[in-house]
């Protein structure tokens, strides 16, 4: 048959490609009326002809008489030739569609024989029905996904461009149905804790449908659960005023009740639904517990005691659900971690929303900082890096909010003291924490304290037997008792001794007992507990092969909480496979732990012993300088790899050419995603390596490693640790009187301070860095710090001074052929020109910067170029062009996981939309900026809130606008920002109206 004219077009959203390739017809009415075959659009004719097709499709196979079709197309005033026109339209459509699809019968027409799901509306109905069933069954995750797929089938206005009263009626009907689906999906979003994400969408929807109270109710709840109580109450005030002005009525009872519950801070408002507690999003369900040992033995009374406490938290006890904390105290090696991990694994089913674990390194020289731990926990719970605040208090509050309504078990291992632990505790019922420490945490309020002593002799013997084997122990029971006694009944010592015997099939238990007795006599000056552990370590170490002993000594030197296989290979100067074989053999002897595939760590007592062995070996002249050489290789490995990551993320940036040379190679990556994954995964051991190099000949390389890893400054989870390391290196380089190294250290510190919005402190560091870099004739640092100082000037509105600094940076970058640096300074110079009122020059300079970025490839830095040009075009009033630039920037920032820059771009999009008279779109983008966070910390958040207030004011939401301005004013006042006066004026004008 004649298939009719066909126009190639992209596949219709919502229809799977495999279905379209089958040759079957597909139709769309949830947008323009269209038809497809094999992915190509069919010509469906004039608007009236499409109106006829839509009327037949929406009758779902039922016959429409000619009279009904005439009424549908023209209503009460049809043309004189209406019947002939209907017949003509039907005839033309038959030629386009498959045979037998449009049929004539009983004086009318019908569409028949369509494949299942051929009509987008039918697919949406099926998906919505399936979503309702999933929701009723308690599977909210699946229900949300189904509703999202249903809503994605809409492609603009229903029956767009189709005339006639029938089409108008269907537009209203299907528009109302879509809103109902949206409300249902948003309700489930809130049930599953997606509060911040929902605020943006709800803000836009309430602006588009201001009298729809259900949307207002959802917005109030989303704001309240996002910690924005004042705005939530302001939404109610705006709604009450609007309903009174427009309809002369009060808000419905449900909305009034919600307002009262918010005023009373009703704790039930913060709770998620019961279904949500059972079906928490899988991707946000961490399972971080270390593996439990297969030979766990004894401690039955402690297991019962701790399990009972966890049962109270999980709601399985008679008293109902509580927030439970248990703190285990005992000497090193007594088995605190083993017991806690064993109990935690037994209780996993009672905490279906996840289990968090951290080694707090409380017995080490550098215990983990609560800020850093909270950052890692928040990331594991699904919080974006950009949404993680800087301060300990804010991180702890966000952590408690994220855990609210969830049932999560937190294992805080090897804690230093209660002060380290308190910020890491959940805040609501249903969660629990297990804490291990060497001190009794009597000052940890409400904690159930457990004192763990050495094992009873029979328990110790049972553990020894389980590792060695019943057959070998049965005939030498007394010797076995002598062994566990010589181990001081400490589980760690018993495990190491037993593992050594298990690996020596020719030894008897008596031989092991005699060797331990000899070691203890040699170490009789030690205290009893230390004596037992040291003797066990000596025995284990003394039986290692030379290669194993060397690996044991050198791996203990690194300060990080753990070490990757690749980094360990650098420490040992061995191929990866040989390194893995050695490390796994040490795991078999219980001298090393496998924290995760490809990652290893020491028990802190074993690490101390390994370092003592390294010192002793070097002191005795058996391996001169092996410690320094090993740590130097580790630093080289991190520096070379981080430099490679930097080069991938910043092509054309010659900074890497000026780094200290390395003798040991690093890893190589072919694409940015894997490179950034490595950097974020290795953040803690990498920064530990930097700090460990202070006061050594490795100082300059350590500072360069900090510089090469500067992407960590924009990672919310790592920024605090990075800043602390930068400050430590500033002190170390100052003490060493190394001007070049100190200049670079202070340059990266000024970066951190700029990103977090601490402008005055950033200026202090940048000025000092420039003086130091100039004295050291470090041209790379001079150019970058000039750029940083220029950015400080932009924040402080000292535009002419900033312009001079950017010109200095551009000249320096050009002198060293640093194209990426040149592009960055050009983009910033554009902003300085804007501040001085030179809009045309700003646009031209921004285009120059973008052109340089474009030469370097489609990288994250190209996004910075589009961003800068978008800002300039906005000031020039060229709003549509600006939107295009920001859209390009947003895509690139998203591809490179630069969420803070995504937030900044959404802020700029909000500016454009507001300037173009689209306050609803402006409010939506401002909300997205708040959810993502922005470069600039609290000051930038103040800017976003001030802009959001302007958009809401334009939408008639005066109370919520004032709430935003008040919060912005509070943030500005904390930082003594120049915008204080502007926001006060906005508030004054708003109140005066």
Curated annotation (Swiss-Prot):
* Name of protein: Regulatory protein AfsR
Q: Where is the NB-ARC domain?
A: 280-579
Record-linked CDD domains: BTAD
* Gene transcribed to yield this protein: afsR
A Pfam family it matches: NB-ARC
Q: What does this protein do?
A: Global regulatory protein for secondary metabolite formation.
Source species of the chain = Streptomyces coelicolor (strain ATCC BAA-471 / A3(2) / M145)
Give me the residues that bind ATP, please. 330-337
Annotated region described as Disordered, given as residue ranges? 1-21
Output one GO BP term.
Answer: regulation of DNA-templated transcription
Among PROSITE patterns, the record links this protein to:
OMPR_PHOB (PS51755), TPR (PS50005), TPR_REGION (PS50293)
What does the PTM comment state? Phosphorylated by AfsK.
In residue terms, where are the TPR repeats? 823-856, 863-896, 942-975
Which superkingdom heads the taxonomic lineage of this protein's source? Bacteria
């Amino acid at each position: 048959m004649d298939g009719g004219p066909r126009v190639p077009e992209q596949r219709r959203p919502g229809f799977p490609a495999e279905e379209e390739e089958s040759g079957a017809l597909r139709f769309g009415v949830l947008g323009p009326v269209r038809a497809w075959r094999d992915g190509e659009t069919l010509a469906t004719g004039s608007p009236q002809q499409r109106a006829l097709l839509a009327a037949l499709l929406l009758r779902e196979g039922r016959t429409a008489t000619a009279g009904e079709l005439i009424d549908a197309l023209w209503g009460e005033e049809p043309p004189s030739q209406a019947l002939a026109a209907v017949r003509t339209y039907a005839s033309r459509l038959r030629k386009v569609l498959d045979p037998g699809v449009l049929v004539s019968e009983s004086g009318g027409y019908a569409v028949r024989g369509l494949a299942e799901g051929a009509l987008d509306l039918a697919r949406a109905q099926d998906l919505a029905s399936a979503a309702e069933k999933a929701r009723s069954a308690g599977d909210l995750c699946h229900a949300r996904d189904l509703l999202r797929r249903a809503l994605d089938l809409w492609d603009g206005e229903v029956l767009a461009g189709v005339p006639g009263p029938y089409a108008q009626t269907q537009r209203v009907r299907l528009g109302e149905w879509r809103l109902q689906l949206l409300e249902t999906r948003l309700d489930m979003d809130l049930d599953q804790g997606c509060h911040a994400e929902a605020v943006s969408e709800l803000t836009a929807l309430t602006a588009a449908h201001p009298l729809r109270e259900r949307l207002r109710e959802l917005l109030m709840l989303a704001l309240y659960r996002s910690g924005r109580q004042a705005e939530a109450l302001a939404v109610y005030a705006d709604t009450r005023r609007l309903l009174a002005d427009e309809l002369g009525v009060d808000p419905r009872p449900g909305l009034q009740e919600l307002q009262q519950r918010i005023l009373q801070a009703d704790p039930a408002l913060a709770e998620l639904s019961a279904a949500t507690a059972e079906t928490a999003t899988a991707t946000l369900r961490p399972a971080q517990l270390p593996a439990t040992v297969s030979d766990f033995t004894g401690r039955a009374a402690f297991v019962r005691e701790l399990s009972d406490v966890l049962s109270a938290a999980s709601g399985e006890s008679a008293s109902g659900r509580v927030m439970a904390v248990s703190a285990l105290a005992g000497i090193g090696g007594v088995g605190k971690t083993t017991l806690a991990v064993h109990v935690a694994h037994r209780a996993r089913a009672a905490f279906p929303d996840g289990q968090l674990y951290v080694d707090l390194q409380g017995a080490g020289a550098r215990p983990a900082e609560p800020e850093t731990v909270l950052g890692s926990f928040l990331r594991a719970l699904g919080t974006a890096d950009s949404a993680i605040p800087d301060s300990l208090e804010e991180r702890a509050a966000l952590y408690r909010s994220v855990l609210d309504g969830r049932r999560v078990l937190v294992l805080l291992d090897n804690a230093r003291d209660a002060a380290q632990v308190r910020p890491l505790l959940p805040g609501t019922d249903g969660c629990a924490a297990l804490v291990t420490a060497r001190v009794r945490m009597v000052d940890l309020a409400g904690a159930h304290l457990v004192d763990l002593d050495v094992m009873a002799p029979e328990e110790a013997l049972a553990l020894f037997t389980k590792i060695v084997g019943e057959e070998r122990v049965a005939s030498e029971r007394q010797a076995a008792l002598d062994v566990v006694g010589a181990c001081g009944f400490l589980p760690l010592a018993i495990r190491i001794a037993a593992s050594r015997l298990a690996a020596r099939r020719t030894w008897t238990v008596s031989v092991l007992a005699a060797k331990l007795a000899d070691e203890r006599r040699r170490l009789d000056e030690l205290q009893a507990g230390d004596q037992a552990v040291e003797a066990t370590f000596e025995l284990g170490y003394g039986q290692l092969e030379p290669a194993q002993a060397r690996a044991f000594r050198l791996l203990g030197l690194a300060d990080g909480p753990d070490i990757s296989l690749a980094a360990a290979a650098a420490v040992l100067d061995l191929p990866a496979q040989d390194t893995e074989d050695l490390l796994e053999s040490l795991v078999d002897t219980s001298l090393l732990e496998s924290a995760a595939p490809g990652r290893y760590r020491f028990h802190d007592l074993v690490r101390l012993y390994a370092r003592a062995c390294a010192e002793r070996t070097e002191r005795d002249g058996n391996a001169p300088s092996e410690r320094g050489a090993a740590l130097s290789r580790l630093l080289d490995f991190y520096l070379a790899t981080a430099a490679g990551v930097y080069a991938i993320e910043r092509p054309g940036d010659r900074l890497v050419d000026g780094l200290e040379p390395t003798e040991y190679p690093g890893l190589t990556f072919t694409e940015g995603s894997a490179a950034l994954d490595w950097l974020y995964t290795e953040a803690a051991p990498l920064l530990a390596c930097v700090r460990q190099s202070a006061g050594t000949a490795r100082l300059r390389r350590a500072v360069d490693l900090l510089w090469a890893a500067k992407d960590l400054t924009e990672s919310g989870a790592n920024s605090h640790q990075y800043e602390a390391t930068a400050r430590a290196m500033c002190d170390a380089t100052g003490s060493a009187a190394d001007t070049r190294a100190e200049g670079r250290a202070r340059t990266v510190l000024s970066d951190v301070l700029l990103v977090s919005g601490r402008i005055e402190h950033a200026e202090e560091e940048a000025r000092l860095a420039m003086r130091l870099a100039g004295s050291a004739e470090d041209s790379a640092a001079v150019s970058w710090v000039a750029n940083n100082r220029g950015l400080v000037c932009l924040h402080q509105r000292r535009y002419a001074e900033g312009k001079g600094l950017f010109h200095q940076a551009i000249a320096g970058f050009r002198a060293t052929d640093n194209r990426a640096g040149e592009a960055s300074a050009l983009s910033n110079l554009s902003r300085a020109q804007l501040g001085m009122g030179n809009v045309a020059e700003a646009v031209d300079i921004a285009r120059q910067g973008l052109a340089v970025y474009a030469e370097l490839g489609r990288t994250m830095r190209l996004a910075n170029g589009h961003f800068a040009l978008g800002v300039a075009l906005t000031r020039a009033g060229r709003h549509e062009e600006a939107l295009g630039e920001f859209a390009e920037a947003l895509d690139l920032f998203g591809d490179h996981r630069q969420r803070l820059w995504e937030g900044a771009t959404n802020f700029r999009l909000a500016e454009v939309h507001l300037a173009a008279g689209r306050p609803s779109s402006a409010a939506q983008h401002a909300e997205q900026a708040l959810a993502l966070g922005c470069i600039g910390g609290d000051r930038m958040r103040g800017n976003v809130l001030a802009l959001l207030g302007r958009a809401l004011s334009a939408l008639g939401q005066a109370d919520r606008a004032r709430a935003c301005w008040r919060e912005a004013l509070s943030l500005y006042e904390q930082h003594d920002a120049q915008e204080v006066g502007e926001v006060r004026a906005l508030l004054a004008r708003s109140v005066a109206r």
